[in-house]
Amino acid sequence: MRSEWRLSTINEICSLVTDGAHNSPKSVINGAYMASVKDFTEYGLDFSSCRMISEEDYEKLRLQGCVPEFNDILVGKDGARYFEDIIIYKQPEKPALLSSIAILRTDRKKVIPEFLYYTLKSPSVRKDVRDNYGSGSAIPRIVLKDFKRMPVAFPPIDEQKKLVSIFVSIDEQIQNNNKINNNLAA
């Protein structure tokens, strides 16, 4: 790690570290989306299988902070795939989230969302989380208090932006290759 990099915790670099609703409102046929970890895809949430809840229940959850904002980092924190499903939320829908998903909102004066996203996606961080921060035997999970104390190394903002541009370029090439492979397989 270079000397200009800083070491901090998730709690110190985020303005918000929370999770979704700990209660599950009744499903309705028409209403607002309510997403859980089962609705994760590699690059977003799949709303085709999302539950719907009443607008009244949705508004209560929105006021409780269970609705992500654009560029929030969403992390699946419960179940067999805990800390595998990680996205930067960039979709226009405004779902309420269940407690199986953590919401991280970075303090952009310290860390840009994309930098934290790529940090959390790195194999070494994932291994560290599974080895040192996970709990639960029947249903593995990471709890918010452990999220908050996780260490994160980060450079100055201008260097974060340079690194992110490299990672984004690689990610875009991977996505293009996957599309080509899927077309060839079809």
Q: Could you tell me what each predicted segment is?
A:
Residues 41, 80, 156:
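Flexible, active-site-proximal loop/turn residues at the rims of small-molecule/cofactor binding pockets
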Residues 7-26, 38-73:
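Sequence-specific dsDNA recognition surfaces
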